[in-house]
Regions:
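Switch/communication elements of ASCE P-loop NTPase nucleotide-binding domains
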Residues: 1-40, 259-386, 393, 402-410
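Membrane-embedded alpha-helical bundles of multi-pass transporters/translocases
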Residues: 13-66, 70-74
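Glycine-rich phosphate-binding loops of NTPases
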Residues: 45-70, 80-204, 266-274
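Short glycine-/polar-rich loops that comprise or flank the Walker A/P-loop
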Residues: 69-73, 118-122, 160-164, 300-301, ...
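Flexible glycine-/small-residue-rich
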Residues: 75-79, 168-171, 246, 260-262, ...
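Extended helical coiled-coil dimerization/tether regions that scaffold
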Residues: 176-179, 188-287, 291-303
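Short helix-loop-beta junction
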Residues: 408-421
Length: 421
């Protein structure tokens, strides 16, 4: 990845199940957003596709060479299913899982090795368009290259075959439970292939739904019609009446809302329902994760990328949901600071991210020296979790020094907060 936001250059590999750990502003969200630019089916429909702040240090034109500085992001999707191999048959390459590299010019026999599998290489290219004074970008297959040096476009229907779903922290509960394009409910309807007739059926019902037919509103609309007829022919403003909306699919997508029971009862004994946005934060997040589980069951291969899945969820729910999504998905990528989430992953499945001068590195965690797996799991929350998430470590001789240093740090923060933070 070259030139994305806070990251100038990186090369990160993810195992099939992993958690990205690191300090705040290390680039975890930037990394997932970069992959979303390549694999997200609805991402390129956003306008503009990229903006000034997506370029490293905001530099999209080299001040010395006066040349446009591009954003280039390449993603290798390995472990393709049989269906995916058939669909992407013209773009297949071979990935060596042991060497962590693509086979180049290898004899055909090497592709039969157990650690070698079909893969696909795609990339995003974004740039500043000088003539239009705007930003552009698109996604392409890395192979094959056409005779004129260009590349075939990697389209939204092709991206849906990859099954990549990215849930940002801020997105959870805002539009995931709506029917807007790219929302989780929209993805489920597409997978169930029920969207073709659903919208037309809803429009037919709304066209026949009487709205505003009380006597007062009827008199008002009749007065409007009479007033208009003084100036224009009668057929220009015939029969004014009200509908719940302008009766278009896009309006329905924006306005249809999921209601849920609140547990409160109305005077007539019926259960009072409210829009899902009025539910508790933990309830909304659990609903979103439940929708992800449905998608995983409907789709053969799903790649989940999720930020902070533990927000507003109790520890036992965090564990249950994380394990469920890992079992049902082809690949699950999380970013989390929760010890209850981190302890569900083996050290090799925790990728520790660091960013120095715009260069990002990712290193799989390993068992500490002389620490056995049983002791690691037993003491993870009290001893090892903070070491994974901290920027630096201070090794002390014993518990007395540890407690004394922590107390001194708190006291310094109270006495001189501007000097000691």
């Amino acid at each position: 990845m070259l030139g994305q936001e806070l990251v100038r250059r990186n090369a990160i590999g993810w195992p099939s199940q992993c958690n990205c750990a690191g300090d705040n502003n290390a680039g975890k969200s930037t990394l997932l957003e970069a992959v979303d630019l390549v694999l997200g089916p609805e991402r390129l429909s956003r306008r503009p596709v990229i903006d000034e702040h997506d370029f490293y240090a905001g530099t999209y034109v080299d001040p010395v060479k006066k040349e446009v500085v591009p954003i280039q992001i390449e993603v290798i999707v390995a472990g393709l299913s049989d269906e995916q191999q058939r669909h992407f048959r013209d773009h297949i390459e071979w990935w060596d899982a042991q060497a962590k590299t693509l086979l180049v010019g290898a004899p055909p026999e090497r592709t039969d090795a157990p650690h070698v599998g079909a893969a696909m290489r795609v990339f995003f290219n974004g740039w500043y368009d000088v003539e239009e004074d705007d930003f552009s970008g698109d996604t392409y297959y890395a192979t094959p290259e056409t005779p004129d040096g260009s590349y075939l476009r990697f389209s939204a229907p092709d991206k849906r075959k990859c099954g990549f779903l990215y849930l940002r922290t801020l997105r959870t509960g805002t539009r995931a439970l709506s029917l807007e394009r790219g929302s989780l409910l929209d993805v489920i309807l597409r997978l169930k292939e029920t969207r073709l007739t659903m919208w037309e059926d809803l429009l037919d019902q709304l066209r026949a739904l009487p709205v505003g037919e009380t006597e007062d509103i009827g008199e008002l609309l009749a007065a409007v019609q009479d007033a208009v007829r003084h100036y224009v022919p009668s057929d220009w403003a015939e029969d004014p009446h009200m509908r719940v909306s302008d009766l278009t699919r896009d309006t329905l997508r924006r306005t249809l809302t999921v209601f849920m029971g609140t547990g409160a009862k109305r005077p007539d004994g019926s259960v009072y329902s409210a829009p899902y946005q009025h539910q508790g934060t933990g309830t909304i997040n659990t609903l979103v994760l439940a929708l992800l589980s449905i998608i995983a069951e409907l789709k053969q291969s799903v790649i989940f990328a999720m930020e902070e899945p533990e927000i507003a969820l109790p520890p036992h729910t965090q564990k249950r949901i994380i394990n469920s999504l890992r079992q049902k998905s082809a690949q699950a990528i999380f970013t989390s600071h929760s010890p209850y989430v981190l302890e569900e992953f083996e050290p090799a499945q925790v990728v520790v991210l660091k960013r120095v001068a715009g260069v990002m590195t990712g290193i799989p965690a390993t068992y500490p020296p002389s620490v056995k797996p049983k002791a690691y799991r037993t003491d993870f929350r009290t001893r090892f979790c903070e070491a994974l998430l901290a920027r630096s470590l201070l090794v002390l001789e014993g518990r007395t020094e540890s407690d004394a240093l922590a107390a001194a740090a708190r006291l310094h923060g109270e006495v001189a907060p501007t000097r000691f933070k």
